[in-house]
Structure formats: C-alpha cells, structure tokens
C-alpha cells in the first residue's frame, strides 16, 4: 500500500478530525442523509463531490486560519476564480488536506481519481492540482499518473504520499517496498536541501518532524535523476520529497503534511500556494 492507515488512525493523527464537528457520527449521519440525493456540495468558495465531501465542508468551515494573515485569506476568497483540483485517491486523509486549503481561503474542488478524465480537468482550467495519498500503487491511482505526465508541464502539481510516487513513476522511477517496512503513524526527522527545497520548506526547521504512513518509496537506485531531483530525505536516506528539474512546479512529499504529527504541515501547504501565486505573477508579467 502506498499509504498505510485506517480512518481511525486518520482521526487520531489529524488536527482536522480531532476538532471537526464531523467527528460526531450522529451529526455526520444526519448531514449525509440530508444530502444523499445531491451529487455535489458547494459552500464558501469550495466544492466537493459525494458524501465524503460533506465532512470536508464542515471541517473547513470550522477550522482556524492561524497559519496565514487574515488579509491574505480574504484576498484569496475574493479574487480566486480558478480552482485547485484535488484528485482523491480514495484516502481518508484527503479531506484533512482540504481543511488546510479551506483555512487558507482557497477555492478548490475534490474529485475521486475515476470521476474525471484528463479532458475534464483541462476544461476546469485549474490553477493547481493536488494528488492525494491513497492505497495501492501508482498504477492503481486512476488518472493521477496521466495527470502528472500530461498536465504537469503547464499546471503546478503537488503530490502527497501516493502523489509523490506517481511523480516518481511518471518520470521513470521504480516504486518499491520501503526497506524499513510499513510506516504507520511514525514520526521521523526529515532533512531538506535548503536551496532545492526552499519552495516547499521555506521557514521550516532543518530537520523538521514529519508523519509517515506508507509502505512504498521511490527506489534510490532507479531514481530518475535526468528528470527529477530529490529535495528531502530521512536519516537513513529514503527520499521524502522531490521536484521536477525543468518543471519546478511539479513537487511532492512522501510524508503527510496534514497530520498533527507534522507540526509544520500547514506551512508546507501554504508554501505551495504561495509558489502558485508567484508563478501566476511571473506568467502574467511575461504576457505584458
């Protein structure tokens, strides 16, 4: 499995699950019943698909916005037109990532990996794409691999756990069983290259603490150095983050920034958002 955990582990390891009203099974069941006939739920600038999306709406609405100034959040809510598309690889942690994005004032839409085609994603004209964690291997991830290959050259992509493995495999790497075995809620120090990793890890201590829920990694021996560069590692040298050499807006992490075991996780999401914003400014300047 790419990400080894259960829904109960997600609740224990995530600040989103810990404080969300959706943690009440009765309240969640009631919300699901009211919206059972509605395929799409939209609220407060974010849109999600299916019953699992109800919890995301509740959690995002309830979350605090302490990671970024209120003015920045309000500006995003007022000015963003294009969504960030979240490809959900059927993982219980996906909506904890969505909560962070909601707290940062982002407009996003969530779709399971078999709900859309690449053409559907193109028509949505997203400003960025987040590829979520998930069970299995990259080949089991619906459109995730194809998204990296076809849309990565033009659209910023952030892969988490399975998402990083999709990036690795898309560009020629081999995904293997982790030498240290299954990581299930393990806390590990992660060290990053302060030059190559500054886009995602700016402002973080080096090393920082990260939550790991995975049994697969990108193999070091077949790492595609011609296309990608590793940006962060565990103490025993396992690759914990990477980016594309040419398309530096393709980035991913093996650990879980959305877990409470990763204290700086929201900052990592914020850094990716700011990277998108800077890229948009750069592209706008090139057009003028």
UniProtKB/Swiss-Prot annotation:
CDD domains per UniProt: GATase1_Anthranilate_Synthase
UniProt keyword list: Amino-acid biosynthesis, Aromatic amino acid biosynthesis, Chloroplast, Glutamine amidotransferase, Lyase, Plastid, Transit peptide, Tryptophan biosynthesis
Binding annotation for L-glutamine: 134-136, 165, 215-216
GO MF entries: anthranilate synthase activity
Enzyme Commission no: 4.1.3.27
Ranges for domain Glutamine amidotransferase type-1: 83-282
Keyword Membrane (UniProt): no
Pfam family, one: GATase
Induction: By the phytopathogenic fungus Bipolaris oryzae.
Assembly and interaction partners: Heterotetramer consisting of two non-identical subunits: a beta subunit and a large alpha subunit.
Name the record gives this protein: Anthranilate synthase beta subunit 1, chloroplastic
The gene coding this protein: ASB1
């Amino acid at each position: 499995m790419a990400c080894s955990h259960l829904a109960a582990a997600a609740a224990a390891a995530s600040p989103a699950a810990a404080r969300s009203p959706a943690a009440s099974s009765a309240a969640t069941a009631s919300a699901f019943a009211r919206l059972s006939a509605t395929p799409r739920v939209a609220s407060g600038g974010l849109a999600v698909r299916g019953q699992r999306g109800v919890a995301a709406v509740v959690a995002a609405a309830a979350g605090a916005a302490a990671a970024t100034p209120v003015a920045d959040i309000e500006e995003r809510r007022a000015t963003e037109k294009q969504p960030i598309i979240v490809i959900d690889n059927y993982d219980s942690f996906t909506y904890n990532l969505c909560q962070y994005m909601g707290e940062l004032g982002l407009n996003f839409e969530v779709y399971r990996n078999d709900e859309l085609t690449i053409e559907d994603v193109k028509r949505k004209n997203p400003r960025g794409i987040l590829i979520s964690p998930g069970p299995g291997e990259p080949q089991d991830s619906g459109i995730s691999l194809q998204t990296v290959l076809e849309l990565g050259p033009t659209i910023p992509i952030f892969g988490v756990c399975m998402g990083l493995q999709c990036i690795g495999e898309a560009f020629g790497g081999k995904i293997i069983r982790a030498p240290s075995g299954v990581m299930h809620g393990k806390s590990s120090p992660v060290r990053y290259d302060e030059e190559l990793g500054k886009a995602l890890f700016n402002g973080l201590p080096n090393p920082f603490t990260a939550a790991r829920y995975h049994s697969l990694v990108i193999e070091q021996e077949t790492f595609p150095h011609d296309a990608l560069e590793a940006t962060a590692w565990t103490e025993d040298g396992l690759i914990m983050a990477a980016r594309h050499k040419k398309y530096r807006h393709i980035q991913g992490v093996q650990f879980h920034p959305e877990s409470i075991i990763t204290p700086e996780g929201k900052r990592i999401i914020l850094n990716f958002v700011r990277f998108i914003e800077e890229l948009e400014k750069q592209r706008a300047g090139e057009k003028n």
